[in-house]
Structures are given as structure tokens and as C-alpha cells.
Amino acid sequence: MKKKSFKICTTIIFFLFSIQSAFCENLITPKPKPNLAKEKKDKYISGIIIPKFKPGTYVSEDQLELLKELEKEKEIVVKRVDGIIIPKNKPLIVHKKRLSTTKKSKYYSDRDLNYARQAVAFMEKSNWKDALKVAKKARAKSIYNFIQWRHLLTPGNRATFYDYKSFIESVQTYPRLSRVKYLAEHKLSTKNQSPKEIIKWFEKHPYTSGFGEMVLGESLIKSGNKQKGIQLIKKGFIRADLTKSDLINFRKKFKKYLTSEDYVKRADHLAWENKHWDLKRMLRYLPKDYQLLYTARQILMSNSYGVDTAISKVPAKLKNDAGLNYNRLKWRVKRGRLDSSLDILFNIKNTKEYMVRPDKWWGERSKIARKLIYKKRYEEAYKVTSKNALSKGPELAEAEWLSGWIALSFLNDPILAKDHFIKFYENVSYPISLSRGAYWLGRTYEKLKDKENSKKWYVIGSKYLTTYYGQLSHMKAKPREKFELSELMQIDKNYAESFYRNKIVATVHLLDELNKDKYTKHILRYLANDNIDKGSEVLAAKLATDIGRFDFAIQVSKIASYQKRFHNKYNYPIISTPNYINGRKIPESALILSIIRQESEFDLKANSHAGAKGLMQLIPYTAKL
């Protein structure tokens, strides 16, 4: 019985073990991959697998031809070298010749265009050595001239005086050449050039800076003309733009020629020009009393701490110094201290001799007067504007108009206003100002019940229809008549041909082709002045428009309009504007275009420091619809 039971158990265990082994084998041991038929293997090796046709599918002649070709491929014997399968040679790929999309330059060869592109790239990285080296390889010398021009105008460059001289003499005439000559003067030195060479240079190119004046003075002294040399050194020292090292150098050189009075005059010049850093460097060289005076002025100018202490240290004899009073006034106006500002203005001498620079004082007077108007203190405002000690310049014109406006609009005194507006009209020349003066004279005579003179001045103002006051004058003089702008001036055809042959015109096109038209601004302004009577302004504005720089065309036309030459086609560009955006009706085109012209001059890339962007100079948040 026991034996029988043992056999049964053994049989069951063996059976279970067999099932488990089979089960594990199926789970763990992967099934062997099926053997592929030789034909199918050849297909895989050859890289060709012929798909089977679906039953009932019609086979076209093209498909049969394809099948035959595939069958031939199938028969290719796969080579073996030392047991390694060598794949079939890949079919040759025929490359289609790409059509060149590079635009040809209008004036330059492909080779020169490439050199120009490289040179400008180096230039924008301030790698002047390589920029000039590459530019010199070009056959067109205008490429090198442009790169060298940009180099010489760059502050802190390493160019020598001879680099400047070579450029000036080779081009004869070029944009901003007066600036290049000014910078050339600052490269002169009796250490590197002989007195004779310097004198000869200034005989041909008169000095334009205080620095050049001093260098010439030194050369004259070394050549024996001591009196004239000392005179030039003293005069140049007052107004020269000097670095810290320049100041130390010239002070050592001219120690026996420069007096303490010369140092005071230079300090005064720097203070009136608001150059407080340069003034600070000068303080140590001043006499004690003047050192205290100009220390106080420097602290007031730079908005530094210790204003009251510095002013208290100024000697009594210098307390009423015009420059000190001016700086104190400016400091108070900036902080909104109206009444204490008036204390200064009403207690100084309103004479040119005392005020030294009445034009500087006017800037603060204007601000004070407008604040007084807001506070309805009209008589004080008139007093501030009318007693100004000015005798000429744009400041005088502004002072006369503001005085006349206050007299007419707030003091109700047209007779007093008339005198101011006439003086304003006689001291201006730009159409925008002439129309303004004429309109307000018309208004003044209208208030005086003098219809004849009123209409006369409105008619005069209506001559300038591109200005705001010109249009207001027209509405007064000819209320029922439409006004028309003058037509574009005629261009001399022969001159136009010579204009476009100008190498500098070629440079403008080159920069446009390189997408660097931002560098054309001063070039276009220069071209505009080439021959105004024959139409250079119009041609320059047209050229600017052709390269897509409406802003530069407007600038050229604006400058022309100041001299009563109106190129309205280019001064007021017209571009299409949508009627609706996102289902919302937008303002009429005339309003949009006028805003664009005023805000960005149609410069697509215009960005303001305040964050305004685009043609209309809108803040992104404001621009959202």
C-alpha cells in the first residue's frame, strides 16, 4: 500500500515538474526566429523588397516595367570578401544646379561687393585693422574711402595725423569733412610734426578748435613769432576741449605764458558750458578765492551734496557773481522753488554786461514764466519774459513771442503785444516762425479793430501752407478757398545724370545692398547740398526713398523747408493704411500719417528711451487693441 502511494506521488510530482519546465521554457527562452527563404533573404540583402500585388488589381504597363527592373536587381549576386557582405554601390545622385538668388550690385563687381561685406562686418566689430585691409583689396576705391571715413570719425581711434591728412587730400570733398578736419587738429603735436609742417597745414586748413589754436601758437613761437604764438595759446586755452593728460601736458609746456587770469577765464567758460567734470579738474589750478567760487558752481551744476556749505564759503566780493547766481537759479527752478527763484531774477541787473550769457538765463526764465501763467500771475510772467537782456538769436525770438502772447491773451493789451510780435517776426527766417508771427499779428490787429492790417498779416501767413499757423492764416484770409501745395521743382536733366555718376551715390546703393542703409544718413545730407539750384535736394530725397529710408528723405526735405524750398512729395510720404483692424475702425489715413511723420519720420526701427516702438511710437501696452 505504501509502495503504491509512493509511486502515485512520484508520478504526480514528475508530471507537475514537466509542466512547469515547459511553461518556463515558453516564458524565458525566446522562440527561434523563422528561417527565411533564400529568395526573401536575397531581397533583404539587396535592399529590394517587392510588394505583392493585391488580388484583382489591374497591373499597368508602367508597373510591369518597374517589376522587370526590380527582378533584375534581385538577381544581383551579393559579394563577400573574407566573409563580410559588401553592400551595393549607391546610385549616383544628380545635383541640380541651384539658381543664384544673390542680387547683382548696381555699381560694384561681385568681388568688390564681397570685400565690402567683409569690411563692414569687421568695421561693426571695431576691428579697424582688418576692415581697412580688406577694403583696400577692392578695385573700387570708394569702398576703402567709406571704411576709412568711418574709422576717422570714431572716437578714440588709433589713426595718426597722417591718416587724416591722406584721407582729406585724397577725397577733397566728402560728408562731414569739417568734422574730420576738426579731429585731425587733435592729432597734431610738435613732438611728431615740425613747426613748419603744422603752420603749412593751418594755412591751407584754418583751425576750428581751441586745441588747434594752441598747437599753431606753439609752432609760431618755435618759428620765432612769439607775440602771435602767445596770443593764440591764451585764446585757445580758454575754449579747448582737453583731456586730463592734455591739461597736464599743456600746463607744463605753457607755464610761463599762462597766467592765473587765463585759468579763471577757462574755468568760467567750462562753467557756462555746464562741463562740470572738466571744471572739477581745473579747481586745483585756480587762485584760492576763485577756487571757492567755482567749487560752489561745480557742486550746484553736478547736483552734489553740500550746496549751502559751499556757497557760504564763497568770499563776499564774489557772492554776487553772475555765474553763481545763474547756477543757484537753475538749482532752485529744478526743485520747483518758484518764489525763491523770483528773488534772484528780480534782484539782479538785467544787462548783458552783468548776465554774461543772457541766452543761458532765458532757458530758466521761460520755465518760470510758464509756471507763473499756470498760477495766473500774469504780470510777473510778463516781467520775467520781457526783461531779458537778449539782443539776437533764437532765444530772443522765443522771448518776444512769449511776451506778446502774455500781453495779448492775459493782460488784454494788444498795443503792447503788437510791438513784441513785430520784433519776433523781424528776427526769424524759418517758414514755421514767419507764419506764426504773421498769424499773431493778424490776431492782434483784429483785436484792435484794424481789419485792413489784420487781413494783410493773415495773407502773409497763408503763404506757408505746410505749417500749422499758415493753415490757420489761410482759413482767416480765404475761408472759402481750398489751398494747394506747390509742385515739386523741376530737375536739370544733365545735372541728374552727373548726380547719379557720383561715386558717393554708388556708396549709398552699396550700403543698401548690404542692408546697412543706417550709415547713409550723413551721406544723403551731403548729397542734398551738392547743387541746390539744379535739384540736388530733390534727387537726394528721391535716393533716400528708393532705398526705403523715408526718414532720411523727410530730414533732407525739412532742412530745405527752413530756407523756403518745399519738396512736399518727400517731406510728406504716403503709405497705405487699413480701415479696420480686428473688426475695429481706425482713424483716417491723414491723422495716422501725420502722427507717424511727427513721431518716427517713418523709421520702422524707431525705439525711444521711454520704450515707445514702431512708426507711431506707441508703448506696447497702449498699442494693444
Residue ranges and their predicted role:
Residues 142, 149-151, 162-170, 182, ...:
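Catalytic glycan-binding domains that act on GlcNAc-containing polysaccharides
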Residues 115, 148, 181-184, 213, ...:
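TPR repeat positional signature
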Residues 102-108, 132-142, 153-156, 165-176, ...:
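Solenoid-like repeat scaffolds
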Residues 125, 154, 191-192, 223, ...:
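Structural motif corresponding to the intra-repeat A-B loop/turn of tetratricopeptide repeats
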Residues 24-106, 527:
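Proline-rich, low-complexity linker regions of envelope-associated factors in Gram-negative bacteria
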Residues 118, 148-151, 184, 216, ...:
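Structural register within alpha-helical repeat arrays
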Residues 2-25:
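Classical Sec-dependent N-terminal signal peptides that target proteins to the secretory pathway
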Residues 122, 155, 188, 220, ...:
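Residue at a conserved register position within TPR or TPR-like alpha-solenoid repeats
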